[in-house]
Amino acid sequence: MAPSFITIDANDMDVDFSTTKPVQAKRTLLLAPPSIATQEDKLRDLFSTFDRSTTDLQMLDRLSAGVVSLPATTYDLVLILTDTDGTRRSEALQLLTRNVYTTLVPAMKAGAKLQTQDSALNASDAMEAVLAGLVQSDNGFEKPNFEPSAAVPLKFGLKKKNKPTPTAVPSIPTGFAAPMGIDSPVTNHDRDEDDELINEDTLLSEEDLTRPIMPPPECQPKTGRRRRACKDCTCGLADKLEAEDKERRANADKELNVMKLDTGDLNELDFTVEGKTGSCGSCALGDAFRCDGCPYMGLPAFKPGQEVQILNDVAQL
């Protein structure tokens, strides 16, 4: 006897054959200051409040020293144990350094919260949390959920393989001249050759030519400083300053030439030439008024015109 086949109609059965995904429990990380490790009653109360299977306890001093590491993207809530009355707040926040945030933030899931037991963090303590990438929320800080960026392809218009057939151009009957238009065989450069060049100076009136050149504001001299022209000056200030410098140098050279004296103009003291006197005119006053090379150096003062004789290197007044 041949076996009979049995068919099952799934539409008549209220059975769900889809596989259900296990719901992952939310994990909590407790960050405690070192002083709480010596109080067993505090630790017993903590684990009576939080489920031990989904809660981890780490010491802040060990995190700050880099002794322990945290698993990445694991915790939904990070709670800093500062006591409800804030007894251990200063101790905990003092250990909540940048090194702790560097280890803590990667271990938080997207949307995870960072909170304290007593109250929210103040502005100075919250600065490190903001720098670590956390966003301030109602009861603390939250790790933002940044979705990964996706590349969007850009579609450009491609050339069509099958080009459309060009439409036939109607032929011009013989005897008619083609109008001078866009399709005229005359090129643009032929038209440019017929244009006359205009002298730009003719566009300026007499008033424009006599109008003084106003330098731009950036060329105006600052208080107590000399005007300086720009590197690519076009307002004429560079030429004007150069002309002033040339005139100043010419005047200085002219004055220098006036001050030059020839050998015959030197009015130095010379005993071989009659009528010559000392250029300082103070030879008779004393050593305090005489020049460095005065031959009367060391002699007492005498009256101008008084005869002085030197015998055996001794002055005779």
Swiss-Prot record:
Lineage per the UniProt record: Eukaryota, Fungi, Dikarya, Ascomycota, Pezizomycotina
Entry binding sites for [2Fe-2S] cluster: C219, C230, C233, C235
InterPro entries: Anamorsin, CIAPIN1, Dre2_N
Key words, A-Z: 2Fe-2S, 4Fe-4S, Cytoplasm, Iron, Iron-sulfur, Metal-binding, Mitochondrion
Subunit structure: Monomer. Interacts with tah18. Interacts with mia40.
Region (Fe-S binding site B): 280-294
Main localization, broad class: cytoplasm
Family listed: Belongs to the anamorsin family.
Spans annotated as Linker: 153-209
Span of the annotated motif Cx2C motif 2: 291-294
Region (N-terminal SAM-like domain) residue spans: 22-152
Motif Cx2C motif 1, residue range(s) on this chain: 280-283
A GO BP entry: iron-sulfur cluster assembly
One protein family per Pfam: DRE2_N
GO CC entries: mitochondrial intermembrane space
Extent of the signal sequence: none
Its job: Component of the cytosolic iron-sulfur (Fe-S) protein assembly (CIA) machinery required for the maturation of extramitochondrial Fe-S proteins. Part of an electron transfer chain functioning in an early step of cytosolic Fe-S biogenesis, facilitating the de novo assembly of a [4Fe-4S] cluster on the scaffold complex cfd1-nbp35. Electrons are transferred to dre2 from NADPH via the FAD- and FMN-containing protein tah18.
Location(s), subcellular: Cytoplasm; Mitochondrion intermembrane space
Entries under HAMAP family matching the protein: Anamorsin
Record's comment describing the protein's domains: The C-terminal domain binds 2 Fe-S clusters but is otherwise mostly in an intrinsically disordered conformation.
Protein name from the UniProt record: Fe-S cluster assembly protein dre2
GO molecular function: 2 iron, 2 sulfur cluster binding; 4 iron, 4 sulfur cluster binding; electron transfer activity; metal ion binding
Record: residues binding [4Fe-4S] cluster: C280, C283, C291, C294
Originating organism: Penicillium rubens (strain ATCC 28089 / DSM 1075 / NRRL 1951 / Wisconsin 54-1255)
Cofactor(s) this protein cannot do without: [2Fe-2S] cluster; [4Fe-4S] cluster
Region (Fe-S binding site A): 219-235
